[in-house]
């Protein structure tokens, strides 16, 4: 609230399924007394291993029908968005099922080709999770998921506008490719508005230096410390 954000969807990091289901229940139970919390976004565990970013590889799984059912049951209506790599086994079916359950699926953390990404959007995915980050990039002979998103007027495209995740020329390109469909997100983690130092992202150790969060193990970008007012 101090920085002008009056509503939020809480993004939950990849964890074991039992932990994720417990976290969803926690969000559900908080919502009656917290009108600022609109629900949860699951960023994982249905992500592509090559594009996992700062997610725990030991917890990544395929979106089987049983796991989809467990998540929907645990959420009891609080799950608003879920990021899925559409190329995973059961990926397209999971997107369709979440969509029919009232959840907004998002394509992201993926290594999908153009055709598979299109299938994901046709199945109900209405968001691209932080475009340019944690996905295969633009290539003239292998277009990938980005052109599939920008050409589809149904898709809202997220960008992390901190000058670090995405450089300014690429932010401008995003607005040029999909005017009126760009949504700034923070991808913020626990160190947001806090001093540099050591933090945790799920079970993973993160070092924050000069406001930039990276995994201690391999230096991979581990979310951001961005405030939405600064992104705008």
Regions found by a protein language model. Name each.
Residues 1, 28, 72-75, 99, ...:
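Non-catalytic positions within long, well-ordered alpha-helices that form the structural scaffold/packing
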Residues 1-20, 36-48, 75-87, 103-106, ...:
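Divalent metal-dependent hydrolysis catalytic cores, especially in the metallo-beta-lactamase
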Residues 16-22, 87-89, 105-111, 159-176, ...:
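Active-site glycine- and acidic-residue-rich loops that bind
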Residues 21-28, 68, 95, 171:
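Generic structural signal for well-ordered alpha-helices
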Residues 23-26, 64-66, 141-146:
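Charged helix-capping and loop-helix junction motifs
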Residues 48-74:
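Conserved phosphate-binding/catalytic loop of the ribokinase/pfkB sugar-kinase fold
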Residues 69-71, 88-97:
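N-terminal active-site wall of soluble small-molecule enzyme domains
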Residues 94, 116-232:
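Active-site-adjacent C-terminal substructures of enzyme catalytic domains
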């Amino acid at each position: 609230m101090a920085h002008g954000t009056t509503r939020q969807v809480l993004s939950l990091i990849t964890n074991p399924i039992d932990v994720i289901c417990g976290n969803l229940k926690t969000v559900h139970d908080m919502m009656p007394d917290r009108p600022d919390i609109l629900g949860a976004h699951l960023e994982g565990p249905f992500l592509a291993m090559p594009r996992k970013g700062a997610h725990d590889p030991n917890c990544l799984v395929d979106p089987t029908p049983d796991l989809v059912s467990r998540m929907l049951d645990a959420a009891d209506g609080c799950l608003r968005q879920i990021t899925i790599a559409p190329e995973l086994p059961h990926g397209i079916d999971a997107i369709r099922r979440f969509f029919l359950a009232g959840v907004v699926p998002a394509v992201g953390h993926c290594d999908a080709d153009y055709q598979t990404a299109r299938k994901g959007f046709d199945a109900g995915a209405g968001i691209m999770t932080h475009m340019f980050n944690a996905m295969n990039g633009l290539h003239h002979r292998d277009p990938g998921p980005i052109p599939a998103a920008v050409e589809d007027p149904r898709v809202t495209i997220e960008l992390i506008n901190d000058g670090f995740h995405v450089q300014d020329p690429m932010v401008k390109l995003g607005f040029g490719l999909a005017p009126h469909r760009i949504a700034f997100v923070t991808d913020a983690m626990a160190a947001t508005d806090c001093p540099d130092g050591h933090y945790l992202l799920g079970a993973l150790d993160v070092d924050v230096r000069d406001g930039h969060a990276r995994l201690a193990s391999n230096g991979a970008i581990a979310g951001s410390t961005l405030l939405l007012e600064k992104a705008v």
